[in-house]
């Protein structure tokens, strides 16, 4: 109440910001006549003038009015479009590291050009981030004309693009690309073995289009580059039959033992998107697994050796109970392809993690692909927070304003529309059953069709869109279907969705990127005429004029019929997605309307609000086919949506808190890796590592401040001989001296080690040896970082159970992951030192060859999978790499001397510790190569 009163007196913060920006818009408008008088060359020359002024110390804020005025004038000449005042405000919001919420059709793409042009003057590069390759390429070509006219270079960064073209794209002043590709390029740049192989420059400024989709919807899904792990495809197929033998329990058992409507073997928690075996289910599963010969008679599923089976069983249960064909995925060309739940697009190449994708493949009877091991991973939150400046734009961000501020420090500013919105949002209609709901939808579509009004029908799954299409076919109503399966025709279908009597059924319209213009889109047809070489300029002009006249007539006809009508067949769990669908109607002051048709069978209502609404319907004794249409019901649905949004926010926040721990470690490892990569000579680094490791070894046998009687000199001599090949007469030295300090012994060892190392370097030359050392260090860092990521993943999966011991899982995760990281650094240090110290090469030629062999062994980016990992549901965005060798020492020794290097090793049992000192079993280390 008090907040509302203050807003009335002082205006909201949003209104105050808009007022400030309007003052700057007045300055820009005052400059317009001045720049209109300039020739094209003079206007283009302003870019270089601005660059020099900025280099001379003038801030971008000081340049802003003139730069925006120049950009607007160039757009008028090249694009035949003049930025509206509200677009100028949008450009300033983007430059101020904020999110501009602009309604659909208000020209976000053109608005972005203002902030992009201004920030490109720094020469540090601007990234414009879109949701798919089609939009990246379209916007780069479309707006590239404007930037090129102003003397700026434009690049487009697409997936599967050759390496040299990527470097050119990133070196341009402005780079368009998708969020996934920018993130994967960052990870790939931190896996290269030569600085010249990197593609990205330091991250300076990014504008994220559809910012809510990228920074919120996809923030639950880390990007992952992975390589193949152990092959267990047969196990997935054997496990696939088990869910069919188990019965589903209806209702969840409460603390008092009530709540179960029908007992069963497993319970599906739709709200938490999880499956749980009941006690009876455990016993039944154990019997089935015993019959299959997967566990011994009477053995528990929880025995340590059966944990993997437990993991596979739950993956199979989730695949059968929670993931449905044509809703969560489609099957094409012997592959299971994920459908993006927010946009309805196919996510080719992405795979769910934790064995879920393999379980779905087994369920659908397609080829089961191997599981993957993570090589590198990052979340969008942590990737985008690395930019010096970050801004975004979307049609719907205000509902998530708190999250943008909390996670990214980005303020949302709602930009006023250029013309007053005229869309009518009608109240939801709720029916008892799905059949009644779809009958009402078909009646509404028929009514609009008869009046010549175009209709856009939004569905939440491919299955629903195809079911509705069948109903319309029976009614002989012509229509177009736009879902993940019709991806290729997307732009064409959307462009014509505003023509009279046009009925378009679409799965979630988020990120479609094409406006629905009343009367249809003439730009595309005009483009075909322009491209026709057989027509003269006069004929082209005549045909385009005729086309525009026809369009005007259709446009007026549709406006008279009420504009575009939006029909929602189900509420999405996010209000924002519903608002995006509604936002397709009523663009730029056009008329339009929207209505959602719901049924009590809908997932959102069933889980969160079904009982309450059903009780209202029964109390009112609603006859069949009669809907409820009341504000109280609509409010209760919005309350349910808020609950889901809150839960999803908590999931994303929790993911970020855990990933922040890994992120700090990632930064350190990548910094270390880049230091190695960029140093001219890593000899000093190796010398420091060698000294540090030898001091630790020495102190194991000669503790600090200890008496001579406590020293284990025989053990130290043996260790130096076995691990380092150093024959040092330490015992004789001590005997021959009247008294000796431990520091003298240490100096003696360090000196001998230094001489041993210098002799090796002298043998082959400093330059050749430095290349070898760099390869060994990079290989060691990469191998153990991969293993560390797997360990962190394993730690995270079970860390929540610490809560039962009254411990804070997050604090426990921080503590244990830090211990793992300290151990990782120790292992890298000792392994690099040992490999470099023990290498045996006779000639420079052999050393060169060995170094090349190692680098070939490291070319693990040829067969890589790129994943965008679904955190909440187990899905992961993946890239597929060659199975990497698990031990650097083995790889390096094999490279140095091949079989001969291994032949010199003592005879060891497969389960004994490996003599290389890695701490692993022999079969998991050098035994793999022998």
Curated annotation (Swiss-Prot):
Enzyme class (EC, first level): translocase
Bilayer-crossing residues are none
Give the record's membrane topology. Peripheral membrane protein
Cofactor entry = Zn(2+)
Which CDD domains did the record assign? DEXDc_SecA (cd17928), SF2_C_secA (cd18803)
Keyword annotations of the record: ATP-binding, Cell inner membrane, Cell membrane, Cytoplasm, Membrane, Metal-binding, Nucleotide-binding, Protein transport, Translocase, Translocation, Transport, Zinc
- Give the UniProt entry's GO cellular component terms: cell envelope Sec protein transport complex; cytosol; plasma membrane
* SUPFAM superfamilies xrefs: Helical scaffold and wing domains of SecA, P-loop containing nucleoside triphosphate hydrolases, Pre-protein crosslinking domain of SecA
Return the cofactor note field.
Answer: May bind 1 zinc ion per subunit.
Q: What is this protein called?
A: Protein translocase subunit SecA
Report the source organism: Cupriavidus metallidurans (strain ATCC 43123 / DSM 2839 / NBRC 102507 / CH34) (Ralstonia metallidurans)
């Amino acid at each position: 109440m008090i907040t509302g009163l203050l807003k009335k007196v002082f205006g909201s913060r949003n209104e105050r910001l808009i007022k400030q920006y309007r003052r700057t818009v007045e300055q820009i408008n005052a400059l317009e006549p001045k720049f209109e008088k300039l020739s094209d060359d003079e206007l283009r020359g302003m870019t270089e003038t601005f660059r020099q002024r900025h280099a001379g110390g003038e801030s971008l804020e000081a340049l802003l009015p003139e730069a925006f005025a120049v950009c607007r004038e160039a757009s008028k000449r090249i694009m035949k479009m003049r930025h509206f005042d509200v677009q100028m405000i949008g450009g300033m919001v983007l430059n101020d590291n904020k999110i501009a919420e602009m309604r659909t059709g208000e020209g976000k793409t053109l608005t972005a050009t203002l902030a992009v042009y201004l920030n490109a003057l720094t020469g540090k590069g601007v990234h414009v981030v879109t949701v798919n390759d089609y939009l990246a390429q379209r916007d780069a070509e479309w707006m590239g004309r404007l930037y090129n006219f102003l003397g700026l270079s434009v690049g487009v960064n697409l997936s599967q693009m050759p390496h040299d073209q990527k470097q050119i794209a990133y070196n341009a002043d402005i780079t368009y690309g998708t969020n996934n590709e920018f993130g994967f390029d960052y990870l790939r740049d931190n896996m290269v073995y030569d600085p010249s192989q990197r593609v990205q420059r330091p991250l300076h400024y990014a504008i994220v289009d559809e910012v809510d989709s990228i920074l919120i919807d996809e923030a639950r899904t880390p990007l992952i580059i992975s390589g193949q792990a152990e092959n267990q495809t047969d196990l997935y197929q054997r496990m696939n039959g088990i869910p069919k033998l188990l019965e589903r329990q209806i209702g969840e058992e409460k603390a008092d033992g009530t709540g179960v409507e029908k007992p069963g073997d497993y319970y599906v928690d739709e709200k938490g998107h999880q499956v749980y075996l009941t006690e009876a289910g455990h016993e039944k599963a154990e019997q089935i697994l015993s019959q299959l010969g997967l566990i011994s008679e009477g053995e528990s599923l929880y025995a340590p050796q059966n944990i993997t089976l437990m993991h596979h069983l739950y993956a199979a249960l989730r695949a059968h109970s929670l993931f449905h064909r044509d809703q969560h995925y489609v099957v094409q060309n012997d592959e299971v392809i994920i459908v993006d739940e927010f946009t309805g697009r196919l996510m080719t190449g992405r795979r769910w993690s934790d064995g879920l994708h393999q379980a779905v493949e087994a369920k659908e009877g397609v080829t089961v692909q191997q599981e993957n091991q993570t090589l590198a991973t990052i979340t969008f939150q942590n990737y985008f927070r690395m930019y010096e400046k970050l801004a975004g734009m979307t049609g719907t961000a205000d509902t998530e304003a708190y999250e943008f501020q909390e996670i990214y420090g980005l303020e949302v500013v709602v930009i006023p529309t250029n013309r007053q919105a005229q869309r009518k949002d009608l109240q939801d209609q709720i029916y008892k059953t799905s059949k009644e709901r779809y009958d009402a939808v078909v009646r509404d579509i028929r009514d609009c069709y008869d009046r010549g009004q175009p209709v856009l029908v939004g569905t939440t799954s491919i299955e629903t869109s195809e079911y509705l299409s069948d109903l319309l076919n029976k009614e002989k109503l012509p229509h177009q279907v736009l879902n993940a399966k019709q991806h290729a025709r997307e732009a064409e279908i959307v462009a014509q969705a505003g023509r009279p009597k046009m009925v378009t059924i679409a799965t979630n319209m988020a990120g479609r990127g094409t406006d629905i213009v009343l009367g249809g889109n003439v730009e595309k047809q005009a483009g075909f005429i322009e491209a026709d070489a057989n027509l003269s300029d006069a004929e082209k002009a005549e045909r385009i004029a005729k086309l525009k006249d026809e369009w005007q007539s259709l446009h007026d006809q549709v406006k008279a019929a009420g504009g575009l009508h939006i029909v929602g067949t189900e509420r999405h769990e996010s209000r924002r997605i519903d608002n995006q669908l509604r936002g397709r109607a009523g663009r730029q002051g056009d008329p339009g309307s929207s209505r959602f048709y719901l049924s009590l069978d809908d997932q959102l209502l069933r889980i969160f609000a079904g009982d309450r609404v059903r009780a209202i319907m029964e109390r009112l004794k609603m006859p069949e086919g009669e809907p409820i249409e009341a504000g109280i019901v609509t409010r209760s649905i919005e309350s349910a949506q808020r609950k889901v949004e809150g839960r999803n926010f908590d999931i994303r926040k929790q993911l970020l808190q855990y990933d922040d721990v890994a992120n700090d470690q990632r930064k350190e490892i990548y910094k270390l890796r880049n230091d190695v990569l960029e140093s001219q000579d890593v000899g000093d680094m190796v010398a420091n590592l060698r000294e540090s490791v030898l001091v630790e070894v020495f102190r194991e046998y000669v503790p600090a401040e200890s008496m001579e009687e406590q020293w284990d000199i025989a053990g130290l001599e043996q260790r130096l001989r076995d691990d380092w090949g150093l024959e040092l007469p330490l015992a004789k030295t001590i005997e021959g001296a009247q008294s000796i300090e431990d520091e003298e012994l240490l100096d003696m060892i360090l000196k001998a080690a230094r001489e041993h190392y210098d002799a090796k370097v002298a043998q082959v030359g400093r330059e050749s040896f430095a290349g070898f050392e760099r390869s060994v260090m990079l290989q060691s860092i990469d191998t153990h970082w991969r293993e560390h990521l797997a360990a962190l993943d394993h730690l995270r999966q079970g860390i929540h159970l610490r809560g039962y011991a009254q411990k804070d899982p997050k604090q426990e995760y921080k503590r244990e992951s830090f211990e793992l990281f300290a151990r990782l650094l120790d292992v890298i240090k000792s392994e690099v030192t040992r490999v470099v110290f023990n290498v045996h090469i006779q000639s420079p030629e052999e050393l060169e060859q060995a170094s090349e062999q190692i680098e070939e062994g490291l070319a693990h980016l040829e067969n890589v999978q790129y994943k965008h990992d679904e955190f909440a549901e187990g899905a992961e965005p993946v890239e597929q790499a060659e199975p990497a060798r698990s031990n650097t020492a083995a790889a390096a020794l094999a490279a140095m001397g091949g079989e001969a290097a291994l032949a010199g090793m003592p005879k060891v049992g497969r389960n004994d510790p490996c003599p290389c000192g890695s701490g692993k079993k022999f079969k998991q280390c050098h035994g793999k190569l022998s």
